[in-house]
Amino acid sequence: MGGKSANKAGYFDKLKGLLEEYKSIFIVSVDNVSSQQMHEIRQALRDQGVVLMGKNTMVRRALKTFLVDSPEYERLLPFVKGNVGFVFTNGDLKEIRDKILANKVAAPARAGAVAPVDVWIPAGNTGMEPGKTSFFQALGVPTKIARGTIEITTDLKLVEAGAKVGPSEATLLNMLNISPFTYGMGIAQVYDQGNTFPSSVLDISEEQLLKAFSSAITTIAAVSLALNFPTLPSVIHSLVNSYKKVLAVAIETEISWPEIEELKDRIANPEAYAAAAPVAAADSGAAAGGAAAEEEKEEEEESDEEGGFGDLFG
């Protein structure tokens, strides 16, 4: 009894120490993960993360004792179910996620196992003797005899994802040397500084965030303007619209201020401004031409001076 209490206290202390040392946790599913895979994952995460396994009842009990000082740990409790473990890290979450998921091994189908994906049998020659044709027929696999061997004529989905693999299906897959499943750690949830979220969030790029943020600002501004309810994104648009209205009123009335006089004059005398535009352009061109001529004249004078010096020393 004393040994169990000591083990429990030791586990509580270890879990508490890891929670205090690391800011991020991957809650990982370890169904069908072999001890060899677990060892390889620990090696891959060396100096970057720590893997901790434990009975769910003990983990939940430990977390509940920590809630008084750290209530944010309550967010972990809903995910402590099934065959799960913890990976603690302070590293880059996307990099650690990829290392956790990288260790996958192909596995043969076992009778009674739930298929995580659809299992297909590809068309092609099996190399098996015709005597086993009845076995294929019993499972509904289309075959023919070609050059003294059994040939599967079309691709066939043998087991659907989520269904249990039957004894006959498992036997056939093993006969064909097909290992349809891959097993490794999966990620149930990510905990980071008091927040929990699915690992797919780690794939959201900065460009996507900026696009979503920009779209949200545009929507808020549009709704605010429609409701005539000022918000930070809509204020600039409201000011511009209001100023346009003030200009419209000033143009139609005797209200005036220095900045509006030129606009009123442009509206009243458009021909004068239209005629002034080509003159301004011509003046600009003449000025540019004059500058070019002046520069050319200076170059000629410099050339003459150089010639004079040549005669002097010749």
Swiss-Prot record:
The modification Phosphoserine is found at S303. This is Large ribosomal subunit protein uL10. Component of the large ribosomal subunit. P0 forms a pentameric complex by interaction with dimers of P1 and P2. Ribosomal protein P0 is the functional equivalent of E.coli protein L10. The lineage of its organism: Eukaryota, Fungi, Dikarya, Ascomycota, Pezizomycotina. Residues 293-308 have a biased composition (Acidic residues). One of its GO terms (molecular function) is structural constituent of ribosome. Phosphorylated. Residues 285-314 are annotated as: Disordered. One of its GO terms (biological process) is cytoplasmic translation.
